[in-house]
Amino acid sequence: VSAIKPLVLVTGATGAQGGAVARELLSADFHVRILTRNPQSPAAQALIAAGAEAVVGDLEDASSLAAALEGASGVFSVQIPDAAGTDAERRHGFALVQAAKAAGVTHFVHTSVCEAGKHTQFPRWDSNYWWQKYWTDKWDVEEAVRGAGFTHWTVLKPAFMMENFAQPKARHMFPHLKQGKIITALLPSTRMQLIAADDIGVVARAAFVDPGHFSGHNIDLAIEALTMDEVALTLSRVLDKQVRAESVSPEKAIESGVFAGWVRSQEWTNEAGYQADIPALVQSFGRRDIVLTPFEAWVKRHAGEIHVDA
């Protein structure tokens, strides 16, 4: 008689990271419950069709969290940065940690961002040039996870997601890609560390399957560090389209239609940037038969979602 499948509540399941985690856990025979405001959305319906159970709930609503967590032994936690100034990321993160602890959850896997925790060492940190609250919110929620007293916890810290080059995200992140251009304020020499959302799912699954190994770890996630020229060359080669990178001033980037907060983040990448120890990561994951996806392989897999008319 097989053991009862452990139940994991996945937040953000209709987004890139949560969706990847939900799919990986379903494929590993976990019982997956997704927390969603709209179970009728195509993303939620696809997961339901794959075997997930959907509960209607909201990180704003503590009573909905208690119901969603009933019987759950694990939680996958992801929050959206608070752009509206309502402290939403911390409120949601803290509420989920508290509700999970109260519900008897034993393994809490949380996704944050690479370099959170090193933020006070960034050049120009004190001037608030880098949207300090983005970094301090991420760190505060991480600290809440580590300090809550879960039997097992794991914090995943991804670098820049490859999904930003595919639809629907590319429309906002790389608005010129459709015309065969990647226009950014990244310097030609700046390398951006990349990770596929699917791989965040793979690592989260590994953490739930083998808490003994992954518990108590803060894990940076990146596989490659590429310049935008290298990104453009890879896209050109795989898609058989002309894609070229243009490095412009921050002012020019904003003028061309790249949103200001993202341009500021590009400046941060020039001056600080994600600094995951990729060789060490590859080695430690390799020992557990986890192979992260290089950018070229990711482009091949997602070619249909990368829209270039050029």
Give the ranges of each region predicted by the language model.
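Oxidoreductase cofactor-interface core, primarily capturing Rossmann-like NAD(P)-dependent enzymes
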Residues: 2-45, 60-63, 67-70, 74, ...
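Rossmann-fold cofactor-recognition segment
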Residues: 47-61
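Acidic/glycine-enriched edge-of-secondary-structure segments
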Residues: 51-54, 83, 192, 306-309
